[in-house]
Curated annotation (Swiss-Prot):
Organism: Thermus thermophilus (strain ATCC 27634 / DSM 579 / HB8)
InterPro entries, alphabetized: EF-Tu_GTP-bd, EF-Tu_GTPase, EFTu-like_2, EFTU_2, G_TR_CS, P-loop_NTPase, Small_GTP-bd, T_Tr_GTP-bd_dom
Residues where Mg(2+) binds: T26
Region (G4) location: 137-140
Similarity section: Belongs to the TRAFAC class translation factor GTPase superfamily. Classic translation factor GTPase family. EF-Tu/EF-1A subfamily.
Name assigned to this protein: Elongation factor Tu-A
């Protein structure tokens, strides 16, 4: 059954709330669903309690608590992620369990930016969250308008420090709680009927306008991680896997990238799904790709098939990493430079050597750290690629490539 249609009239965008504990991320998330629901019968309201007791999910062997809500505006459909705990944010952003096309940074006007505000902005920069919109919350608790200006200036400075365009980022001032209380009193409150509800609309407008609709996976250059390889007598070698992005059809040139000393170029002579011929395989399809003139020995699990020139093999990179705590099934002890675990990229493990940054002697379970890795074999890498760190098959950490070195 190819190409079942999921009918969606509006473009889809993934967002999430980030920011310091108790600055109002979850209250704002609830308010967004209520406000959007008043104008759109398709939106399901979620209350603070529904969001706060976020279900556990697993991503790359790590347990994370994450709440997912959905809402829509006249222009777009949104999936929104909110995490109850600070550690959940770190794990979520590093594993990419909840990819964000843009983030809503919540800052309490009463406190201004706090340590986790900074940490979440840094994480957003490292893991490649491309856009941030700011909601300055709890402005009803601040009497002095100059103080509000000061907090806004501090937030913009902080964004600039981490290479976000702090001077251009929209900053909306409001009170998530007062908006939510109004929606509880009258769930049908519309735009223009209450000043605090209007602030939530102002935020929705800013998200609509400022965060661009992302390029769909299917429109990106073709890439398929190889999961398995077999031979069809008389026809040649087939590589199977799930297409990560782009599309592929007979006659396309592709490269086999990674693990081997040389990147090899070949031509696709067939694309199959469940033993039936496909006109074209697209992102998300599990397919077999028949490769011209390639022997069974020349392609293996862990390599990728990709559009020529779109991705290259590398051995050395910098990464942002979360190291699992003992209670999460991680190591019981710390590790030093020279540590040699396996790095699991897409479909395979490759051994690598860790080099800690200057001034860091040792990394403990539960830490979030940036370090350099040198792999013993080249792998198809790019910035933003997620991986797991494993020892003997069990996950001890999760990371994201932040910079390619060689």
């Amino acid at each position: 059954m190819a190409k079942g249609e999921f009918v969606r009239t509006k473009p889809h965008v993934n967002v999430g709330t980030i920011g310091h504990v108790d600055h109002g991320k979850t209250t704002l998330t609830a308010a967004l669903t209520y406000v959007a629901a008043a104008e759109n019968p398709n939106v399901e309201v979620k209350d603070y309690g529904d969001i706060d007791k976020a279900p556990e999910e697993r991503a790359r062997g790590i347990t994370i608590n994450t709440a997912h809500v959905e809402y829509e505006t006249a222009k777009r459909h949104y999936s929104h992620v909110d995490c109850p705990g600070h550690a959940d944010y770190i794990k979520n952003m590093i594993t990419g369990a909840a990819q964000m096309d843009g983030a809503i940074l919540v800052v309490s006007a009463a406190d201004g930016p706090m340590p986790q505000t900074r940490e979440h902005i840094l994480l957003a920069r490292q893991v490649g969250v491309p856009y941030i919109v700011v909601f300055m919350n709890k402005v009803d608790m601040v009497d002095d308008p100059e103080l509000l200006d000061l907090v806004e200036m501090e937030v913009r400075d902080l964004l600039n420090q981490y290479e976000f365009p702090g001077d251009e980022v929209p900053v909306i001032r409001g009170s998530a709680l007062l908006a939510l209380e109004q929606m509880h009193r009258n769930p049908k409150t519309r735009r223009g009927e209450n000043e605090w509800v209007d602030k939530i609309w102002e935020l929705l407008d800013a998200i609509d306008e400022y965060i661009p609709t992302p390029v769909r996976d299917v429109d990106k250059p073709f890439l398929m991680p190889v999961e398995d390889v077999f031979t069809i007598t008389g026809r040649g070698t087939v590589a199977t896997g799930r297409i990560e992005r782009g599309k592929v059809k007979v006659g396309d040139e592709v490269e086999i990238v990674g693990l081997a000393p040389e990147t090899r170029r070949t031509v696709v002579t067939g694309v199959e799904m469940h033993r039936k011929t496909l006109q074209e395989g697209i992102a998300g399809d599990n397919v077999g790709v028949l490769l011209r003139g390639v022997s069974r020995e020349e392609v293996e699990r862990g390599q990728v098939l990709a559009k020529p020139g779109s991705i290259t093999p590398h051995t050395k990179f910098e990464a942002s990493v979360y190291v699992l705590k003992k209670e999460e099934g991680g190591r019981h002890t710390g590790f030093f430079s020279g540590y040699r675990p396996q790095f699991y990229f897409r479909t395979t493990d490759v051994t690598g050597v860790v080099q800690l940054p200057p001034g860091v002697e040792m990394v403990m379970p539960g830490d979030n750290v940036t370090f350099t890795v040198e792999l013993i074999k080249p792998v198809a890498l790019e910035e933003g690629l997620r991986f797991a760190i494993r020892e003997g098959g069990r996950t001890v950490g999760a990371g994201v490539v932040t910079k390619i070195l060689e």
